[in-house]
């Protein structure tokens, strides 16, 4: 039986420098250097010194796996947040097709679209006509939208949000596919109109503008998300109204386009995880998101209620295209587009933040620091 320390005590100078690293045995070193030991990983064979490159390659995956066991919110949003994204996304897509059906398959709906299409260009104030005529340039809409979308992709790539880059790619494909509905959806002949009798929904230019705006919103960091929502929503409204002033599209085309894009974006956000989220340790509540999101959602709902009230007032004159219904139809159309855009972008802003930055202990503190590599440490002794 071996002697213990009580039988052969080791006397050390209390004033001498102590090398705590050399004093630990190999088992203690392994417990310190194992990045998953504190996270409850299963013990395995004792590792020998590995190259730094091999260690770094597997460290990210190992830490994600360990953090997922310790705190699942570090690698994926709450289930309730993902369910909200899916539910609101489906509701917006359903609303898009509901508006299209009401405005295309009913007499009052076609009359409403026809009044706005025919009378809006000549009933705008002078300053608004100038702005709309500038925006209603196809090359300008494409150029500005591409710049906004490119800024979003660059922001995601610079932040190394690779899962988010993949989500953006899927969203772009879905938005492009939605424009193919224009050649598929029917438009029955119900009333005689001066506008083209073929289906024109959804609006391709509005889809492009809205898609670029939502890409920017979901890709930028927390500090500028609220600003991105305001800028993107404003650009979407300008493009949507401009294509109506230029008589390229009807009111229902624009509303359908905005709701489709935001609805598809919310469904894509339901699959957010890992690098599609903010880094752990940087997840905090955002005052700007709370204020701007609340204003957009509340303001959007109020504007939509006002638009619905005005439509109800002019409804008796729609089927005869009465002159007294013209002004109300125009006001309700523009106000409705602004309200729907504000509500959609406000919801998207709020849901993007709760999927990107779910609050938890590790989300606030951050992941444990990476320990030094044994081989590299021994080489520096």
Enumerate the predicted regions with their spans.
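N-terminal transmembrane-helix/juxtamembrane module of multi-pass inner/ER membrane proteins
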Residues: 2-144, 182-193, 325-381
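Cytoplasmic membrane-interface segments at the C-terminal ends of transmembrane helices
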Residues: 68-83, 151-166, 187-188, 214-228, ...
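Alpha-helical transmembrane segments
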Residues: 84-97, 170-174, 296-303
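C-terminal TM-helix exit segments that contain a strictly Trp-centered aromatic cap at the helix terminus
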Residues: 94-105, 177-186, 242-245, 300-313
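Hydrophobic alpha-helical transmembrane segments
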Residues: 136-157, 212-213
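Alpha-helical transmembrane segments in multi-pass membrane proteins
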Residues: 166, 170-174, 178, 257, ...
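Membrane-embedded catalytic cores of phosphoryl/pyrophosphoryl-handling enzymes
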Residues: 193-336
């Amino acid at each position: 039986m071996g002697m213990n320390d009580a039988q052969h005590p080791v006397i050390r100078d209390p004033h001498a420098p102590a090398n705590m690293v050399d004093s630990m045995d190999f088992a203690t070193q392994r417990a310190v250097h194992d990045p998953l030991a504190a996270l409850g990983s299963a013990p395995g064979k004792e590792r020998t010194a590995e190259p730094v490159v091999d260690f770094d390659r597997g460290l990210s995956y190992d830490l994600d796996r360990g953090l997922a066991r310790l705190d699942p919110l570090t690698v994926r949003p709450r289930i309730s947040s993902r369910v909200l994204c899916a539910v609101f996304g489906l509701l917006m897509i359903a609303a898009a097709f509901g508006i299209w059906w009401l405005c295309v398959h009913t007499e009052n709906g076609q009359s409403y679209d026809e009044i706005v299409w025919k009378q809006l260009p000549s009933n705008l104030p002078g300053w608004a006509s100038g702005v709309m005529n500038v925006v209603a340039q196809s090359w300008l809409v494409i150029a500005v939208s591409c710049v906004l979308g490119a800024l979003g992709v660059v922001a995601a790539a610079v932040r190394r949000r690779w899962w988010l880059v993949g989500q953006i790619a899927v969203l772009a494909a879905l938005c492009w596919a939605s424009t193919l509905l224009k050649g598929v959806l029917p438009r029955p002949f119900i009333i005689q109109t001066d506008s083209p009798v073929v289906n024109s929904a959804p609006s391709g230019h509005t889809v492009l503008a809205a898609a670029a705006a939502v890409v920017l919103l979901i890709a930028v960091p927390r500090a500028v998300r609220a600003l991105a929502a305001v800028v993107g929503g404003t650009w979407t409204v300008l493009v949507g109204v401009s294509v109506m002033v230029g008589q390229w599209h009807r009111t229902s085309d624009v509303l359908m386009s905005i709701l489709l894009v935001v609805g598809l974006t919310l469904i894509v956000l339901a699959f957010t995880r890992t690098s599609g989220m903010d880094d752990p340790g940087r997840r905090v509540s955002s005052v700007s998101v709370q204020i701007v999101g609340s204003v957009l959602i509340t303001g959007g709902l109020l504007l939509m209620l006002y638009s619905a009230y005005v439509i109800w007032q002019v409804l008796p004159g729609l089927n005869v295209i009465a002159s007294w219904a013209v002004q109300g139809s125009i006001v309700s159309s523009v106000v409705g587009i602004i309200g729907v855009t504000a509500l959609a972008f406000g919801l998207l802003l709020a849901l993007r933040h709760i999927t990107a930055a779910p609050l938890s202990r590790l989300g606030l503190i951050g992941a444990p620091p990476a320990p030094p590599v044994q081989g590299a440490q021994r080489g520096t002794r």
